[in-house]
Swiss-Prot record:
This is Protoheme IX farnesyltransferase. NCBIfam families: cyoE_ctaB, PRK04375.1-2. The chain crosses the membrane at residues 31-51, 52-72, 96-118, 122-144, 151-171, 180-200, 225-245, 247-267, 281-301. Its main location: membrane. Converts heme B (protoheme IX) to heme O by substitution of the vinyl group on carbon 2 of heme B porphyrin ring with a hydroxyethyl farnesyl side group. Its EC number is 2.5.1.141. Pfam families: UbiA. HAMAP family: CyoE_CtaB (MF_00154). Carbon 2 of the heme B porphyrin ring is defined according to the Fischer nomenclature. InterPro entries: Protohaem_IX_farnesylTrfase, UbiA_prenyltransferase, UbiA_prenylTrfase_CS, UbiA_sf. The gene is ctaB. GO terms for biological process: heme O biosynthetic process. One of its GO terms (cellular component) is plasma membrane.
Length: 305
């Protein structure tokens, strides 16, 4: 473990430079926005009614929980963040937020997210939120990320749980429907993350994070991306076959899945500048957003009232 952690010099911390924007960046707003959206869709698809105010509290708690995990992740990864071009402008690395302050912010934010989820929503949703934060920090960030080539696969559990939390916030249950939502994100995560690793391979090698391209090579990684893309295509159609979404969902999600497979296949003909990997990565974000937008707009049941 110690060989993977390199000392960094953040310089003198100037608290006067810290802004609200820095604290928002500390919570990984791009990741958090997707978490909020998938969590909301999970709530919408639950075949029960909930007061909009309670639904709003649940969404805020999910957002704060995701933000707390992101902040603690940045605290723990501040050494490797300073080595990667993609992460060198994060608040702790830039020296505008002190590392201990970031940790405290993350812990306090996470505590209130879990507490108010339990107080205002239900205990199951609160437990799932707590488990998600714990899993992302302890299982993925601390244990797997710097040790295992399967870091993204196993660690993807935490990123796939927000719709399950949202569903539980309304229904107080875990169902087949919410499990399928989980599977869609869980299977989507590896090809999405490995595409990023393909064009950030040098960064991951430099900070000794064992991402698949750095350990197994690009050809092996592309084969794995294609396998997971095929699995994703199959799983993404399941909401129609269990009656959760209508025929429009089946058609459009099928088309989106075919395009996903096309981009996965195009990786085998990529250029040295990783142009296809970048395109696949960008499309994968669009794909997940649009799939969940479809899940929301073509569902066969209504909930929040």
């Amino acid at each position: 473990m110690s060989s993977l952690v390199r000392p960094i010099n953040l310089g003198k911390i100037n608290h006067s430079q810290s802004t609200v924007k820095d604290y928002i960046l500390l919570m990984k707003p791009r990741v958090m926005s997707l978490v909020i959206f998938t969590g909301f869709v999970g709530m919408w698809l639950a075949p029960y009614s909930v007061h909009p105010f309670i639904a709003g509290i649940a969404v805020v708690c999910i957002a704060l929980g995701a933000g707390s995990a992101g902040a603690i992740n940045m605290w723990y990864d501040r050494d490797i963040d300073s080595l990667m071009k993609r992460t060198q402008k994060r608040p702790i690395v830039r020296g505008v937020i002190e590392s201990d302050e970031a940790l405290s912010f993350g812990l306090i934010t996470g505590f209130f997210a879990v507490f108010f989820m339990a107080l205002c929503v239900n205990l199951l949703a609160s437990f799932l939120l707590l488990f998600t934060i714990f899993y992302y920090i302890c299982i993925y960030t601390i244990w797997l990320k710097r040790r295992s080539i399967q870091n993204i696969v196993i660690g993807g559990v935490s990123g796939a749980l927000p719709p399950v939390i949202g569903y539980a916030a309304v229904s107080n249950t875990i169902s087949l429907e919410s499990s399928i939502l989980f599977l869609i994100i869980f299977i989507w995560t590896p090809p999405h993350s490995w595409a990023l690793a393909l064009f950030c391979n040098d960064d991951y090698k430099n900070c000794k994070v064992p991402m698949m391209p750095a350990v197994k090579g690009t050809l092996y990684t592309k084969k794995q991306i294609l396998i997971y893309s095929i699995l994703l295509f199959i799983v993404s159609l399941m909401p129609f076959f269990i009656g959760m979404n209508n025929f429009i969902y089946l058609i459009i999600s099928g088309i989106l899945g075919v395009v996903f497979l096309y981009y996965a296949g195009s990786l085998f003909y990529d250029t040295p500048d990783n142009k296809q990997a970048k395109r696949f990565f960008a499309y994968s974000i669009f794909y997940l957003f649009f799939i969940f937008l479809l899940l929301y707009s073509t569902n066969t049941i209504s909930t929040i009232s």
